[in-house]
């Protein structure tokens, strides 16, 4: 097994995510040693010490993009082009066309476990929510207790921190609250019923207007970390507080979406390839089919195409408001490695109307 070491910041994933991908086929080292086979320079402006040492040792130095191509080439050896109606080469053409002509812009959310409590107005998973002094805090009715309980914060998105996306707000604070429940508050019978979960939007907010953590605690408000510490039976998809960063991405339709086969046929027609009426499972071999999911990294996301474990639960015309994936190494897990997503219509999003949001959670 060849050894590899990385230097510089990756443009579209964390070092941890890149390492996880590489470990499937390489021995990953943290320093440049004499027996190192490959040094991947993820950032051309990265420090020169590792580069100089690698060149001195005769280590092969490649770019981040070249390394990803190496991973793809290794995968190609395991493909059977005869498995599907489309060959592997044709499948790659179709995937590229889907991204080029039919891709949807979104914002990928990267998580970092917070070392200390984050500012009240910051984008975050978990932690304490922003809440304006004097405003009534949202509660839910608990089957276990006589009195209503304060919601806990699942996610808070400060849209001033999010890359601009068509029809999405460029400012304002979105909050998603949840309750301790085996379905994380979701209602299978009515996915828009905000009884055990809640969406709250703030147009005008600031640190100066925010209640302090002490004031929130006095009202009975807890972070998810505190709720888990106080109740061993509490169930939430996250275990900690997470700082968030955002980057714009282009997503493509995946086989779990109702529109996938329609987009594949459009792409095939554009490329002058045969257009099949068979299902996606027949059109593509197993490996090619799975490649459309692009699921090598956690898909926490705003906008773009959603991801489902079981099947498309969105309504026709819905946009993805927010999606939280499972990220086991960081203590984020929806059931059995599932995903939670929230949808609304384009018109409701433009009007900042969050009363008809659809909440779905599923897992394998």
Predicted regions mapped to residue ranges:
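Preference for intrinsically disordered or flexible, low-complexity segments
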Residues: 79-364
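DNA strand-break repair and replication-stress modules
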Residues: 1-80
């Amino acid at each position: 097994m060849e050894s590899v070491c990385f230097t510089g910041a990756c443009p579209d994933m964390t070092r941890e995510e890149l390492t996880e991908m590489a470990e499937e086929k390489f021995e990953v080292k943290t320093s440049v040693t004499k027996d190192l086979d490959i040094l991947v320079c993820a950032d051309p402006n990265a420090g020169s010490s590792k580069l100089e040492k690698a060149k001195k040792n005769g280590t092969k130095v490649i770019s981040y993009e070249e390394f990803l191509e190496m991973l793809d080439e290794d995968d190609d050896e395991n493909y059977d082009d005869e498995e599907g109606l489309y060959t592997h080469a044709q499948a790659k053409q179709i995937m590229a066309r889907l991204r080029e002509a039919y891709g949807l812009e979104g914002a990928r959310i990267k998580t970092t476990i917070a070392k200390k409590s984050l500012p009240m107005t910051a984008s975050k998973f978990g932690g304490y929510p922003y809440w304006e002094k004097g405003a009534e805090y949202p509660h839910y009715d608990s089957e276990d207790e006589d009195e209503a309980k304060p919601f806990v914060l699942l996610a808070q998105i400060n849209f001033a921190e999010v890359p601009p996306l068509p029809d999405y707000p460029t400012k304002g604070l979105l909050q998603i609250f949840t309750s301790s429940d085996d379905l994380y508050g979701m209602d299978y019978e009515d996915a828009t019923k905000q009884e055990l979960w809640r969406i709250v939007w703030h147009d005008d907010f600031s640190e100066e207007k925010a209640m302090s953590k002490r004031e929130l605690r006095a009202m009975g408000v807890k972070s998810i970390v505190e709720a888990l510490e106080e109740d061993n039976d509490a169930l939430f998809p996250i275990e900690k507080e997470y700082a968030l960063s955002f980057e714009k991405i282009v997503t493509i339709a995946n086989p779990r979406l109702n529109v996938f086969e329609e987009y594949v046929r459009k792409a095939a027609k554009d490329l002058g390839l045969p257009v099949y009426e068979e299902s996606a499972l027949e059109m593509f071999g197993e490996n090619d089919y799975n490649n459309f999911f692009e699921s090598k990294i956690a898909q926490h996301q705003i906008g773009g195409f959603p991801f489902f474990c079981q099947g498309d639960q969105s309504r026709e015309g819905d946009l993805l408001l927010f999606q939280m994936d499972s990220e086991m190494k960081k203590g984020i897990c929806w059931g059995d490695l599932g995903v939670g997503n929230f949808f609304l219509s384009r018109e409701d999003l433009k009007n900042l109307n969050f009363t008809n949001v659809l909440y779905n959670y599923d897992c394998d």
